[in-house]
């Protein structure tokens, strides 16, 4: 199996099968690992360059199994022009490959809001079509 430049953490409990890859998503290919049940994205898509977002979505799609899920948190900044993404941007990139559902908005506590200038996080669940 090809390697990816990064670190792999694996759960040692035989009752649970969990792998956590810490690497660049753009280096990750289905030849490294595929058929994931789920991917947790906490800001990676939002932080990616606009020109790379479609490639990001394509890579995620390629490594998920048929009914795989993406759990995505998108930060809502106090100043809207500082990188807040709306559902249209997500939909334009994940398009027909996924069915998207907005689950909730998690409001930031006052300390987090002041320190990072963030109102909270929009949480999305996307199912692979």
Please name every model-derived segment.
Residues 47-59:
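A short, conserved alpha-helix within the catalytic core of class I
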